[in-house]
A protein has these predicted regions:
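Bacterial N-terminal signal peptides that target proteins for export
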Residues: 1-7
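Bacterial N-terminal signal peptides
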Residues: 7-14
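Extracellular beta-strand-rich solenoid/capping regions of secreted or surface-exposed proteins
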Residues: 44, 48, 60-74, 82-104, ...
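Leucine-rich solenoid repeat scaffolds
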Residues: 281-311
Length: 311
């Protein structure tokens, strides 16, 4: 008669252990329900596969490196999962080298490393989608290597208080995209830069639309958009406000300042609004070094902003 209660107790203990394993930490892999104490453990559990990591609200002083697979990193509640001040391999809070990564609702802040390139995300390879995320008060928001076969899309996100230009060193930027196949920036805000450019990219195809660039509280900043090697695509329906504290105030958008290895023929810059903050120096809206035909139409430019120049 006593065996039945003992068996029931054993089953209860097993169920309790299984529940503890599923809820073992703030990083939960969907599907399996397994919880992990660190983000790296959750990433390693997905490995070369495909999966989603749900991240509980909290401030995490940790980082992770994804070397394979396709992973979605999603805050359970947008804006409540914060990665603060820790970089893997002296690079970033997330170092991504897998097939694909999706970042949803995360916050990256206070990332700094010895070479002054500390980023929320260092993308070394693979496709990347970032949405509803915040990058703030770090040396860089997103920094990438080159991967011409892959694409990057950033939407409904904010980049604030980023960038640095150390003496005798290379600048860091709000985002610095290498030679990726394409870059799309949609409904995103850039503000309060602390050096460098807001958007710097070597991608041959770009889309920057329905976004805002508020440089009124920027410090030692450069261009709003730097298409370093030239690019085709669209820059449209954005709002630009250039501030007074600039390292380089000569242009808002510069096409091909470093090289002309990408075609810029047909690049469309249209339906944007650009103004100067009080006390800001006169500037040029678009400066081109590609020598190709660029379509610059229907932009609303405030006083002391020249439409176009070639240099």
């Amino acid at each position: 008669m006593r065996k039945a209660p003992a068996a029931a107790l054993a089953l209860a203990l097993l169920a309790s252990a299984a529940t503890a394993q599923r809820s073992g930490g703030p990083f939960t892999v969907e599907g399996s329900g397994r919880g992990f104490a660190t983000l790296q453990e959750a990433v390693d559990a997905i490995g070369e596969g495909t999966g989603t990591i749900q991240i509980a609200p909290g401030t995490y002083r940790m980082c992770a490196a994804q070397n394979a697979g396709s992973i979605r990193y999603a805050a359970r509640e947008p804006g409540t999962a914060i990665f603060d001040g820790v970089a893997c391999a002296g690079k970033a809070a997330l170092v991504l080298s897998g097939r694909e990564a999706r970042i949803e609702g995360l916050v990256f802040q206070n990332i700094a490393v010895p070479d002054r390139n500390g980023a929320g995300i260092r993308l070394q390879a693979g496709n990347l989608v970032v949405s509803e995320s915040l990058f703030r008060d770090s040396e860089q928001g997103i920094l990438t290597h080159d991967d011409p076969a892959s694409a990057i899309r950033i939407e409904q996100s904010t980049f604030s208080g980023l960038g640095v230009c150390p003496e005798n060193g290379s600048c860091a930027h709000s985002i610095y995209i290498g030679d990726f196949g394409s870059l799309s920036v949609v409904r995103t805000r850039f503000e309060r830069g602390r050096g460098g450019h807001y958007v710097k990219t070597r991608s041959p195809r770009v889309e920057v639309v329905d976004s805002s660039f508020d440089d009124s509280e920027g410090r030692a900043t450069n261009y709003m958009i730097d298409l370093s090697n030239g690019a085709t695509g669209t820059i449209a329906r954005n709002v630009f406000v250039q501030g007074r504290n600039k390292e380089n105030y000569s242009a808002m958008i510069f096409v091909g300042p470093e090289a002309q290895s990408n075609s810029s023929a047909g690049l469309a810059i249209a339906d944007n609004e650009a103004t100067l903050a009080p006390g800001a120096n006169a500037t040029t809206f678009v400066v081109d070094r590609s020598g190709e035909t660029i379509a610059i139409d229907r932009n609303r430019l405030g006083p002391q902003i020249t439409k176009f120049a070639r240099r």
